[in-house]
Design a protein with these regions (language model features):
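Solvent-exposed loop/turn segments at secondary-structure junctions
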Residues: 68-71, 78, 158, 177, ...
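Acidic glycine-/aspartate-rich tracts in secreted/extracellular proteins
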Residues: 77-79, 136-137, 201, 213-214, ...
Length: 435
């Protein structure tokens, strides 16, 4: 009986969100769109989006965390809104967050994490209006609103380390309260979202919530390759201890450099019973981080395939060349491809020169980081310094730039495509004209 009552309350809550959202708009959008800007003003590059929140509406800049579980916003820095409502202990709103605590005034809350710095603080759970643009996949459309969008109240200290003007973090992870889940519940569209990071600080990338088309001078949804998303049943990220991972993992079976298989300890490529190993995708790690033995094997194979002399490395990288020794083309630096082989040898994530290399004046480096020698680059998710990374391969943001990624949450699969292969890029969504 208790389970039935809780289920009824949960269903009623989702129905309330949906009906309330529709009440605030005269049509039901099939998809939403947000701009995504690369910001290098802080020590770690971040990818920033903007929503409108509160009453009256205020533009709020947020760092995007692909593997984040929720939205958190700094409530100490002038947060005022006539429509903000705390979530009461025992309510359906609280239960959506999984594990939570209750304060003396009967408001529920939980830990919020700054995944750039690793700092966590406890914050109350609130709901408030959020407004974003709809889209038909070709252009932005009408503004639509969710009147009771749930978030955690962060603090001034939690905001430290975020890019200039950013007030919180927008989580896109596998929870009931991430942005993709709340938007799809509010507007009853498909449980899909797509993200495309621009490599430039002067042009916008894009996030789509909902199904395609996704027009970036072509409908990218038509050219995607698919691979299953894998669940890691153990999560050691601060604020989620004891819960399954909310991050996105894929099954890398092997790595090739210039078409040749790199010898690896294959047990590192799978997730063990303690949640260690495997491959995840991250927008808060600026570069791909590899477990030490994987890094050394890949770097050695890469140097051999390039055939040029290495030079003194530039931190945080360990493998660098003189820029004059590397040619360039439309695909970026002319270096061998690094291929992540997925469920079979026909399904491959190709990492070409534009994504594998980082140019630093007269030096150009392999943009992969050794987790053992550079534990500080991992931020959260490393155990005992960095010699034992929780995840063997973390695909970082530089390797994601100008790659289109669609996350189909209902089917638990990832669609991906390098836009260099399609002669387009992530900055080609038309934000300037309306549908």
């Amino acid at each position: 009986m208790v389970v039935s009552v809780r289920f009824f309350i949960l269903c009623s809550f989702f129905s309330f969100i949906i009906s309330s959202s529709i009440a605030h708009t005269s049509f039901r959008p099939k998809a939403l769109v947000l701009p995504l800007t690369k910001d290098v003003s802080s020590s770690i590059p971040q990818y920033i989006t903007k929503i409108n929140q509160r009453t009256p509406l205020v533009p709020v800049k947020l760092t995007v965390d692909l593997g984040g579980g929720y939205l958190w916003v700094n409530c100490e820095d002038g947060y005022t809104s006539s429509t903000s409502k705390p979530a009461r202990c025992g309510s359906a709103q609280c239960s959506l967050f999984g594990l939570y605590g209750c304060s003396g005034d009967k408001v529920c809350g939980r830990s919020a994490t700054n995944t750039i710095t690793g700092l966590s603080t406890y914050g109350d759970i609130h709901g408030d209006i959020v407004s974003v643009q709809s889209t038909n996949g070709n252009n932005p459309g009408r503004v639509v609103s969710v009147p009771n969008f749930l978030f955690i109240c962060g603090s001034n200290s939690l905001q430290n380390g975020l890019a200039s003007g950013v007030k919180g973090i927008a989580g896109l992870g596998k929870t009931k309260v991430s942005l993709p889940s709340q938007f799809s519940s509010a507007f009853s569209f498909k449980r899909k979202f797509a993200i495309c990071l621009s490599s430039s600080t002067s042009t916008n990338g894009v996030i789509f919530f909902g199904d395609g088309p996704y027009n970036l001078n072509m409908d990218v949804s038509k050219v995607l390759t698919f691979t299953p998303l894998i669940t890691n049943h153990v999560n050691t990220v601060s604020g989620f201890l004891g819960e399954p991972s909310v991050e996105y993992f894929i099954g890398v079976k092997s790595i090739r450099v210039s078409g040749k298989k790199v010898p690896l300890n294959n047990t590192l490529l799978s997730i063990n019973q303690n949640g260690i190993g495997g491959t995840k995708i991250s927008t808060v790690n600026p570069y791909t981080v590899l477990e030490t033995t994987i890094y050394k094997a890949v770097a050695d194979a890469f140097v051999k395939a390039v055939g040029a002399q290495t030079v003194a490395p530039v931190a945080p990288f360990g493998t660098c060349f003189a820029t004059k020794d590397i040619g360039f083309s439309r695909m970026g630096p002319g270096v061998p491809s690094i291929d992540l082989v997925l469920q079979n040898k026909e399904v491959v994530w190709n990492i070409i020169g534009a994504n594998s290399m980082v140019q630093l004046n007269d030096v150009i480096c392999l943009g992969f980081v050794d987790a053992g020698s550079n534990p500080s680059t991992s931020k959260v998710g490393f155990v005992m310094g960095g010699l034992h990374p929780m995840t063997s391969i973390t695909i970082g943001a530089h390797q994601l730039e100008n790659n289109f990624l669609q996350f189909d949450l209902a089917a638990s699969r990832l669609g991906f495509r390098s836009l260099f292969l399609e002669h387009t890029n992530c900055a080609n969504f038309n934000f300037t004209s309306s549908a």
